[in-house]
From Swiss-Prot:
One of its GO terms (biological process) is peptidoglycan turnover. This is Anhydro-N-acetylmuramic acid kinase. It comes from the Bacteria. Belongs to the anhydro-N-acetylmuramic acid kinase family. ATP binds at G13, T14, S15, M16, D17, G18, I19, D20. It comes from Agrobacterium fabrum (strain C58 / ATCC 33970) (Agrobacterium tumefaciens (strain C58)). Pathway: Amino-sugar metabolism; 1,6-anhydro-N-acetylmuramate degradation; Cell wall biogenesis; peptidoglycan recycling. Disulfide bonds: none annotated. Its EC number is 2.7.1.170. Catalyzes the specific phosphorylation of 1,6-anhydro-N-acetylmuramic acid (anhMurNAc) with the simultaneous cleavage of the 1,6-anhydro ring, generating MurNAc-6-P. Is required for the utilization of anhMurNAc either imported from the medium or derived from its own cell wall murein, and thus plays a role in cell wall recycling. GO terms for molecular function: ATP binding; kinase activity; phosphotransferase activity, alcohol group as acceptor. The keyword Nucleus does not apply. Keywords: ATP-binding, Carbohydrate metabolism, Kinase, Nucleotide-binding, Transferase.
Length: 373
């Protein structure tokens, strides 16, 4: 075992609703102890800035460019993360010296793997200065330099967690992370990894609900629960080349868009998109080395009972079971933030963050940029 570090992971996903924070004690190979976790929502005004940044970022041709007001958005995003870290440390009675490193994801504003271009705004140096803690950030870029898709990165952490799956779960088990975009991690015999983005997660549902109601998401799946699946709309989405391509690739939030207003009712749209999330997962799972017997679901999507119902119903037809991460003894809400803590420690040790079976990179590579406080 290597030197055990206490790391904080920070994650701001495609939903752009807030910051997930988690503490992890790890040597970058095994998980020694799970620490506290938390969630800090963005102020509504800041969320609007991040949404505007998505449009501005379309002009980027080189990953260090910050056109228009993107530089100011990056500064505000970093300061919001710093404030969240300080509040979290105070709440859980940590001193700055108790934390060895922060794993900082930032906010993805552009992801074009076919152009080897990915941009996560977030100033690691400013975060280190504001918090007084060393920071590892920009963890996707080196993978792309070496021919990878830059995503997903969480499979390395899923592999560590798989060693702690309780007895009684049929294998092979597949971890399913339902964030804005969903991704799958298969862990086979001997630690064989296969992982890739599986399709839209919460993203289209969130966009649909916000466009019609002004609310950020379908809380508890209440809107979707009152609707019906529009099969023709599902079929249209499933005709996307993404689902038929032999080579799996990572997704950008612009790869799929919600239906046009008026195309279906609010409730039917929400239900259909919830079904699509499940259908996309099962379709993409057909590219795994073998069929899953258990799907372990983490991320915000596990809290939407309609998504879970649709996924479970589709999986049952294939003889598989769907469970929330908590049923396997994990914290499904903190898992992505924990992953960034874990990856930061791996980066410090020069261990691989990505593998040929996860991002398509030519060989296992490390990543991340370290900034000392």
């Amino acid at each position: 075992m290597g030197e055990v570090k206490t790391a904080i992971g920070l994650m701001s996903g495609t939903s752009m609703d807030g910051i997930d924070i988690a503490v992890l004690r790890t040597d970058g190979e095994s998980v020694v102890r799970h620490g506290p976790s938390g969630y800090f929502p963005y102020d509504p005004g800041l969320r609007g800035i991040w949404q505007k940044a998505l449009t501005t970022a379309k002009a980027i041709r080189e990953r260090r460019e910050r056109p228009g007001d993107l530089g100011e958005a990056e500064r505000k995003l970093t300061l919001a993360h710093a404030a969240a870290v300080k509040s979290f440390l105070h709440r859980h009675r940590f001193d700055v010296g108790d934390i060895d490193v922060i794993g900082f994801h930032g906010q993805t504003v552009l992801h074009r793997p076919d152009e080897a271009l990915t941009v996560q705004i977030g100033d690691g140096a400013l975060l280190a200065e504001e918090t007084g803690i060393d920071v590892v950030y920009d963890m996707r870029a080196n993978d792309m330099v070496h021919g990878g898709q830059g995503a997903p990165l969480i499979p390395a952490y899923h592999m560590a967690l798989s060693a702690n799956l309780p007895d009684g779960f049929e294998t092979p088990a597949v971890f399913v992370n339902i964030g804005g975009i969903s991704n799958l991690t298969y862990i086979g015999e001997g630690g064989r990894l296969a992982a890739f983005d599986s399709g839209p997660g919460n993203m289209l549902i969130d966009q649909w609900i916000e466009a019609h109601t002004g609310k950020a998401f379908d809380k508890g799946g209440r809107t979707a629960a009152g609707g019906s699946v529009v099969a023709s709309l599902v079929a249209r989405y499933m005709e996307s080349p993404f689902f038929s391509a032999n080579i799996r690739r990572s997704l950008d939030r612009s790869d799929f868009v919600p239906p046009q207003k008026g195309e279906v009712s609010l409730a039917d749209g929400a239900r259909t998109l919830s079904h699509l999330t499940g259908a996309a997962i099962l379709k993409s799972a057909s590219y795994l080395p073998e069929a899953a017997k258990t799907y372990v679901v983490c991320g915000g999507g596990r809290l939407n009972p309609v998504i879970m119902e649709e996924l479970a119903g589709l999986a049952a037809k294939q003889g598989a079971r769907v469970i929330a991460a908590e049923e396997a003894g994990f914290d499904g809400g903190a898992m992505e933030a924990e992953a960034w803590a874990y990856l930061a420690v791996r980066s410090l040790r020069g261990l691989p963050l990505t593998y040929p079976g996860t991002t398509g990179v030519k060989e296992p590579v490390t990543g991340g940029v370290l900034v000392r406080a």
